[in-house]
């Protein structure tokens, strides 16, 4: 059976759940952003269309290429043999998603794609297929990402999340696929393995969670409820196979003894829920009735699962915030008093309501209901559940919000962030960089550095002068956190903080925390692991971006010695250009991190050398010669692992001489340090050809801090 590559899209946040769902269908897939990808047959793809509760679109991958202008786009689309995919008498429509650096108008992309397809058919058959935006035979999807265009052929014409049962809905509807996702995440599939599974939704609204739970309990394939479902009319479509699989799905439904109950205080939405339940054909397992959540009672003989998506106040309470918070406080009390042993999951974007429940969460997961970001809070009702606990993050948020009310001087900081971002945008678009310095103590009263790492912020507070009131300094720091959250639209949990001060000895290598959470970032053609929480620095020095490129270019297909290599980022860039690298550092932790960076970039770390050693001692005994050496020592170090204290101003002459002893006669030594008052030794200037390359190595985002480092290119005379 012919194999294809398929991408199955879903709402952001449920990718892993979708991957697990496909595993249960016997399909192995890879998790991607907003979906999963798998290699398989048309039959496999049909199974996803029929049985998936979580998928939005099942798409056959047609082609991917880099395009930089409209002619490129036209030629790329024309290079695809569309007659292999559908006949000229079949209609189609085009949908566009994502963003492209060079195409701001998606209508233009759609028109150019349509022209290329139609022209191809006309040139070969003297006929052209027609566009049908309402009821097409086929849907072609283009996903734009940076300068790449990915082309897909959709198997399902309309989104799979539509089940057709929801004829009547409230003001804040929950997508069917998201309802299914939170049920699965909350443990409903495990609950169904019990003799008598129990599910309660105490704020059921129009009944979406109840119905999705019943469909799973009765093993009803979601596609069977979608009366308007239409499979693609491609040359790859096998109608007989599709019909057979649908028949198998119909015969796989089962009787269940699950108890599924819904409650709501609003009779109007309960009436809608009842009609939706009948529409779905699951009235035999669901009961609904009017009840205030504050009066919720446990009338069941065994423990079960409570899953709910509260109305956030839009539907019932409007701006009556106090009333809404009282409801959640009462809900929390009822749970702790009468539902011992139960598991609870609450999906909401209103965090204050969760605080009012005064229950300890066991897990939190981010989901998206359309564009609305929500959190699924999970609880286990036991003797430890009733606990009013403020996490460090919650404390930081509380202090930040309060600090913002104490003065308005942080408005200048916010305006500077906006101005800097506007100034950097053209350069960021040109380079494609996602990690950069946005702010560096531009306003003296806000002595912080703001580094952007895609959706994360690394906020470094410069140690305040002894003459500055520490309380005022602390207040300004929290005001900075508040404005980064508000102005840059960064989630509080993605703002990571540090106080910059001189580190001594082993402090330079010790962990700050032990969260052990790594993130992947991109820098040009390389990827790196960064850690915002556990170490003093993140794992990459953004100000060394340009010198890393110089080193990599010079070391292309040559040998590189990287001294004080840290996490080996320069070595990775060089290795990607064919260099054979040797990285030397005192810290085994950072060398292991470096090896992981090599692996992340699909580079065989075994073909490169990683040496844990004091660089000075190692250089004294090294006999090998290298084409390029990158020497980037710390300003000061008195680590016990070193034979002596390192002071870069005092010791740079020794370091450079030792490094030059390991350099080939026609080689290049790149020397860098961050000591602001650094002066190059006259003896070194006399002995070697030394060129200061500070300006060359200064990136656009560090222009406001021109003394951030000293960079030299050194060669033999």
From Swiss-Prot:
Database matches in Pfam families: Methyltrans_SAM, RlmL_1st, THUMP, UPF0020
GO cellular component terms, A-Z: cytoplasm
InterPro entries tied to this protein: 23SrRNA_methyltr_KL (IPR017244), DNA_methylase_N6_adenine_CS (IPR002052), RlmKL-like_Mtase (IPR000241), RlmKL-like_Mtase_CS (IPR053943), RlmL_1st (IPR054170), SAM-dep_methyl-trfase (IPR019614), SAM-dependent_MTases_sf (IPR029063), THUMP_dom (IPR004114)
Cystine connections: none
Enzyme class: transferase
Coiled-coil annotated spans: none
CDD domains attached to this UniProt entry: AdoMet_MTases (cd02440), THUMP_AdoMetMT (cd11715)
EC number per UniProt: 2.1.1.173, 2.1.1.264
Domain of life: Bacteria
Signal peptide: none
Catalyzed chemical reaction(s): guanosine(2445) in 23S rRNA + S-adenosyl-L-methionine = N(2)-methylguanosine(2445) in 23S rRNA + S-adenosyl-L-homocysteine + H(+); guanosine(2069) in 23S rRNA + S-adenosyl-L-methionine = N(2)-methylguanosine(2069) in 23S rRNA + S-adenosyl-L-homocysteine + H(+)
SUPFAM superfamilies named in the record: S-adenosyl-L-methionine-dependent methyltransferases
Record carries keyword RNA-binding: yes
GO MF, one example: rRNA (guanine-N7-)-methyltransferase activity
Entry keywords, A to Z: Cytoplasm, Methyltransferase, RNA-binding, rRNA processing, S-adenosyl-L-methionine, Transferase
Subcellular location per the Swiss-Prot or TrEMBL entry: Cytoplasm
All residue ranges annotated as the THUMP domain in the record: 44-155
Role, per record: Specifically methylates the guanine in position 2445 (m2G2445) and the guanine in position 2069 (m7G2069) of 23S rRNA.
Family: Belongs to the methyltransferase superfamily. RlmKL family.
Name by which UniProt lists this protein: Ribosomal RNA large subunit methyltransferase K/L
């Amino acid at each position: 059976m012919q194999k294809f590559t398929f991408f199955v899209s879903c709402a952001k946040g449920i990718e892993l759940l979708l991957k697990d769902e496909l595993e249960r269908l016997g399909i192995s897939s890879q998790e991607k952003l907003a979906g999963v990808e798998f290699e398989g047959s048309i039959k496999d793809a049909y199974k996803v269309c029929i049985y998936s509760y979580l998928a939005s679109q099942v798409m056959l991958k047609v082609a991917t290429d880099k395009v930089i202008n409209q002619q490129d786009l036209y030629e790329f689309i024309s290079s695809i043999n569309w007659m292999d995919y559908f006949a000229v008498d079949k209609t189609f429509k085009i949908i566009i998603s994502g963003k492209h650096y060079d195409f701001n108008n998606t209508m233009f992309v759609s028109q150019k794609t349509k022209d290329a397809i139609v022209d191809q058919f006309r040139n070969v058959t003297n006929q052209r297929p027609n566009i049908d935006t309402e009821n097409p035979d086929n849907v072609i999807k283009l996903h734009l990402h940076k300068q790449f265009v990915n082309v897909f052929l959709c198997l399902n014409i309309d989104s799979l999340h539509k089940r057709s049962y929801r004829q009547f809905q409230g003001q804040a509807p929950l997508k069917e696929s998201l309802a299914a996702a939170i049920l699965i995440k909350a443990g409903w599939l495990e609950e169904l393995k019990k003799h008598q599974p129990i599910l309660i939704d105490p704020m059921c609204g129009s009944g979406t969670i109840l119905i999705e739970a019943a469909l799973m309990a009765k093993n009803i394939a979601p596609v069977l409820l979608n009366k308007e479902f239409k499979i693609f009319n491609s040359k790859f479509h096998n109608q007989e196979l599709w019909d057979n699989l649908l028949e198998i799905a119909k015969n796989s439904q089962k009787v269940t003894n699950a108890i599924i109950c819904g409650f709501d205080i609003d009779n109007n939405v309960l009436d809608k829920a009842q009609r939706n339940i009948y529409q779905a054909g699951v009235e035999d397992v669901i009961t609904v009735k009017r009840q205030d959540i504050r009066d919720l009672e446990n009338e069941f003989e065994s423990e079960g699962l409570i899953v709910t998506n509260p109305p956030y106040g839009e539907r019932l309470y409007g701006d009556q915030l106090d009333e809404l918070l009282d409801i959640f406080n009462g809900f929390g009390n009822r749970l702790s008093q009468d539902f011992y042993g139960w598991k609870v999951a609450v999906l909401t974007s209103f965090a204050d309501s969760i605080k009012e429940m005064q229950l300890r969460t066991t897990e939190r997961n981010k989901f998206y209901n359309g564009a609305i970001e929500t959190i699924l809070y999970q609880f286990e009702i036991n003797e430890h559940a009733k606990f009013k606990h403020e996490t460090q993050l919650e404390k930081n948020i509380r202090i930040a919000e309060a600090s913002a009310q104490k003065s308005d001087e942080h408005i200048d900081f916010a305006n500077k962030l906006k101005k800097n971002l506007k100034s950097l945008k053209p350069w960021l678009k040109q380079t494609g960089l996602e990690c950069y310095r946005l702010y560096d103590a531009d306003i003296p009263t806000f002595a912080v550095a703001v580094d952007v790492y895609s959706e994360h912020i690394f906020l470094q507070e410069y140690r305040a002068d002894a003459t500055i009131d520490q309380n005022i300094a602390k207040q300004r720091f929290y005001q900075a956190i508040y404005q980064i959250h508000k102005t840059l639209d960064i989630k509080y949990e993605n703002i990571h903080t540090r106080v910059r001060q001189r580190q001594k000895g082993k402090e330079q290598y010790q962990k700050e925390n032990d969260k052990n959470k790594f993130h992947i970032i991109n820098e040009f053609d390389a990827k790196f692991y960064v850690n915002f929480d556990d170490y003093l620095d993140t794992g990459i020095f953004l100000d060394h971006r340009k010198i890393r490129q110089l080193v990599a270019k010079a070391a292309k297909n040559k040998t590189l010695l990287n001294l004080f290599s840290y996490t080996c980022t320069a070595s990775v860039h060089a290795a990607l250009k064919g260099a054979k690298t040797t990285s030397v550092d005192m810290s085994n932790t950072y060398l292991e991190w470096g090896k992981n960076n090599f692996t992340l970039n699909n580079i065989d770390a075994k073909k490169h050398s990683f040496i844990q050693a004091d660089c000075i001692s190692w250089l004294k005994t090294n006999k090998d010669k290298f084409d390029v050496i990158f020497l980037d020592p710390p300003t000061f170090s008195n680590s016990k692992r070193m034979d002596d204290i390192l002071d870069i101003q005092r010791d740079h002459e020794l370091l450079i001489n030792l490094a030059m002893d390991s350099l080939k006669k026609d080689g290049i030594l790149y020397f860098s340090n961050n000591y602001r008052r650094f002066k190059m030794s006259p003896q070194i200037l006399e002995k070697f050809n030394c060129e200061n390359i500070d300006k060359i190595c200064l990136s656009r985002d560090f222009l406001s801090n021109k003394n951030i480092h000293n960079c030299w290119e050194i060669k033999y005379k």
